[in-house]
Amino acid sequence: GSLTGLISMPRT
């Protein structure tokens, strides 16, 4: 849900 979150794991 965050900036880096979207890049590493967008929706896991």
UniProtKB/Swiss-Prot annotation:
Keywords: Amidation, Neuropeptide, Secreted. One of its GO terms (biological process) is neuropeptide signaling pathway. One of its GO terms (cellular component) is extracellular region. It comes from the Eukaryota. InterPro entries: Periviscerokinin. It is found in: Secreted. Expressed in abdominal perisympathetic organs and abdominal ganglia. Its main location: secreted. The keyword Secreted applies. The modification Threonine amide is found at T12. Mediates visceral muscle contractile activity (myotropic activity). Belongs to the periviscerokinin family. This is Periviscerokinin-2. It comes from Derocalymma versicolor (Cockroach).
